[in-house]
Swiss-Prot record:
Protein name from the UniProt record: Small ribosomal subunit protein bS16
GO MF annotations, alphabetized: structural constituent of ribosome
A GO cellular component annotation in the UniProt record: small ribosomal subunit
Source species: Listeria innocua serovar 6a (strain ATCC BAA-680 / CLIP 11262)
Pfam family, one: Ribosomal_S16
Keyword Ribonucleoprotein: yes
Ribosomal protein found in the keyword field: yes
Family to which this protein belongs: Belongs to the bacterial ribosomal protein bS16 family.
Keyword field: Ribonucleoprotein, Ribosomal protein
GO BP: translation
Gene3D superfamilies for the chain: 3.30.1320.10
Length: 90
């Protein structure tokens, strides 16, 4: 089972709102997910990103791969740096 951390589109037409979810890569984008670990709202002026850092690191240590967009969001929040430091044992 290839697990990915990716965005699940919510909200109404022309007003997207995303949940950051852990899902099997075979499931559809807006389909079933294993766990919701955060939210992303691109419509607010300072973009709103809320991520459960502990759950994200747990899933990444278990082998979940973030999508490109989620990887950028995690980098902006400083989670990718913490993940790499933990992986290298710093």
């Amino acid at each position: 089972m290839a697990v990915k951390i990716r965005l699940k589109r919510m909200g109404s037409k022309k007003k997207p709102f995303y949940r950051i979810v852990v899902a099997d890569s075979r499931f559809p984008r807006d389909g079933r997910s294993i766990e919701t670990i955060g939210t992303y709202n691109p419509l607010l002026d300072p973009v709103e990103v809320k991520i459960d850092e502990e759950a994200t690191l747990k899933w990444m240590h278990n082998g979940a791969k973030p999508s490109d967009t989620v990887r950028n969001l995690l980098s902006r929040e400083g989670i990718m740096e913490k993940f790499h430091n933990q992986k290298l044992g710093k």
